[in-house]
């Protein structure tokens, strides 16, 4: 290519992921069953990256598949095991599930770690993982990140990490969970859809 005078096109690159061998891989128990009939039956989780002028930030979320509500989220400057544990702890603390919940992720090293698997067992959660390289197995989590980047980030580069955290908080807690309507939830925002479910349950 060099001799022919051809230059390779270099695309936009995200942060480099650390390579690590999978230690514990669980079966794909979710099997793309994205529409449970009640809250706290199936959760999905994933990580994405956000660019700032102070460096990269990593956003991890946990989404309840019933309502598409973000029930846990964490932003950290490094993609470590702690970020996924923190976000799952937030989800457990907020929801306090009374029955076993299926928690689905990809096969990233954070999720195949002993710490992740140990946390699941100690909190009566059942693990599930996408097939390697198959993003469609975790389509709802991927869809949330696409919405976030299309509706709020819009290809911008945040000035500071603090600004980023504040804006992501606003999007998730003040807009997405409480105002954004979803076709999968009768065109209601996640919080309203869950409230309606519990109202109907009490009236039975």
Can you say where each PLM-predicted feature lies in the sequence?
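Charged DNA-binding/catalytic regions of mobile-element recombinases
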Residues: 1-204
């Amino acid at each position: 290519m060099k001799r022919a005078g051809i230059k390779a096109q270099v695309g936009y690159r995200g942060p480099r992921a650390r390579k690590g061998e999978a230690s514990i891989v669980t079966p794909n128990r979710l099997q793309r069953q994205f529409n449970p009939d009640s809250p706290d039956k199936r959760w999905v989780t994933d990580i994405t990256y956000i660019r700032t002028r102070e460096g990269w930030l990593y956003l991890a979320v946990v989404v309840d598949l019933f309502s598409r509500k973000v029930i846990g989220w964490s932003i950290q400057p490094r993609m470590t095991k702690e970020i996924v544990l923190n976000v799952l702890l937030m989800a457990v603390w907020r929801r306090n599930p009374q029955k076993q919940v299926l928690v689905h992720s990809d096969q990233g090293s954070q999720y195949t770690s002993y710490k992740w698997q140990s946390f699941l067992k100690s909190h009566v959660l059942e693990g599930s993982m996408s097939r390697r390289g198959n993003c469609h197995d975790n389509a709802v989590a991927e869809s949330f990140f696409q919405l976030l980047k299309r509706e709020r980030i819009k290809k911008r580069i945040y000035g500071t990490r603090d600004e980023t955290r504040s804006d992501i908080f606003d999007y998730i807690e003040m807009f997405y969970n409480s105002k954004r309507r979803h076709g999968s939830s009768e065109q209601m925002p996640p919080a309203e859809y869950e409230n309606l479910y519990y109202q109907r349950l009490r009236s039975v």
